């Protein structure tokens, strides 16, 4: 199957041979997460380290690419997250979370290449991985690739002296509409409001439904409002056991409603989804009055774009936003390094031997 990202394959190779730092951008569903690691495995010896923001994406991508290759996960493609290692000596492409990547950069031999996928998420651990790749002497010659659908590519490339490369085109169009009655995203009455939007979408459009909600509490509220509906309702949340998450990616003969947090926002494709219902909210860690809090906040324009793109990965789709188009949102979420206490970052930076590493 040809994907939009394939159009830059030759240029990707040329630019990496000219300079080993590259920022790759393309629309959601273009194939960044699945194609780029494979290209790198063909170009460079050693382990290709692919850093994903969440464990769900690590396991899902390793499973998907292994299935395409006709083998079990842990062969050519593997995943490694906290408390779970599905890799072997034969693994060439390893999908891992930022925390695992940092430990490997300290303890393991230098990888053949490093990919930081969905870099717009800008967790402090992702930033530290990039800082290490750019600053630690034994890693400076390792090719470093940042990928995203929504990042400001020039701003990301500048501190790294990296080049940028963009793939045009997307998989399928997505029609976006707004709920005019609600001015701004809010969690009040989210259960009945989302259930009403789901019911309307199921009656007027084809395909499965993906609903973005800020947390498990809101997921349970929508689940209760749906009641005993004929569709199969599945929860997509980081607390779900691996067996439950693997079921999410298996095809079904029944129509499905996926109730998800932002773990479903990037890197993964849920089969059959052509409808997205977006609450416009997410849980974000903030530092307030001397302590860390997990707050429910409106998402950025970048996240809005990512979520809408989930509806256009398998066919033309629709996205319903549960707030008014008049509500203004920030273009990007502030990097986590600007929102939280930096004790853990400083400890890991010291362990890596980083001094004075900084990102705009």
Residue ranges and their predicted role:
Residues 1-360:
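P-loop NTPase motor module signature
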């Amino acid at each position: 199957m040809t994907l939009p990202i394939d159009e830059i394959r030759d240029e990707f190779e040329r630019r990496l041979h000219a300079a080993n730092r590259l920022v790759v951008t393309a629309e959601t569903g273009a194939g960044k997460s699945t194609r780029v690691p494979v290209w790198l495995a063909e170009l460079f010896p050693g382990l290709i380290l692919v850093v994903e923001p969440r464990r769900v994406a690590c396991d899902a991508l390793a499973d998907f690419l292994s299935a395409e290759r006709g083998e079990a996960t842990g062969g050519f493609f593997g995943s490694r997250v906290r408390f779970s290692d599905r890799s072997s000596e034969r693994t060439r492409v390893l999908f891992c979370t930022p925390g695992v990547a940092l430990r490997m950069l300290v303890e393991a031999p230098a990888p053949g290449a490093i990919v930081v996928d969905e870099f717009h998420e800008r967790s402090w651990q992702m930033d530290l991985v990039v800082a290490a790749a750019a600053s630690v002497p034994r890693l400076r010659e390792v090719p470093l690739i940042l990928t995203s659908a929504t990042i400001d590519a020039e701003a990301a490339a500048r501190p790294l002296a990296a080049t940028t490369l963009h793939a045009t085109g997307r998989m399928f169009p997505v029609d976006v509409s707004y709920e005019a009655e609600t001015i701004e995203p809010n969690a009040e009455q989210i259960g009945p409001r989302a259930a009403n939007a789901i019911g309307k979408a199921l009656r007027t459009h084809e395909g499965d439904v993906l609903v973005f909600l800020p947390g498990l509490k809101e997921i349970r509220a929508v689940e209760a409002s749906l009641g005993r509906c004929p569709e199969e309702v599945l929860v997509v949340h980081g607390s779900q056991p691996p067996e439950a998450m693997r079921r999410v990616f298996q095809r079904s003969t029944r129509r499905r409603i996926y109730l998800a947090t932002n773990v479903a926002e990037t890197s993964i494709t849920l089969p059959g989804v052509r409808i997205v219902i977006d609450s416009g909210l997410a849980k974000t860690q903030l530092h307030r009055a001397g302590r860390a809090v997990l707050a429910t906040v409106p998402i950025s324009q970048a996240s809005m774009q990512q979520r809408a793109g989930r509806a256009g990965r398998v066919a033309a789709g629709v996205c319903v936003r549960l707030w008014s188009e008049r509500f203004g949102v920030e273009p990007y979420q502030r990097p986590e390094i600007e929102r939280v206490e930096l004790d853990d970052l400083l400890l890991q930076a010291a362990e890596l031997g980083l001094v004075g590493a900084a990102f705009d």
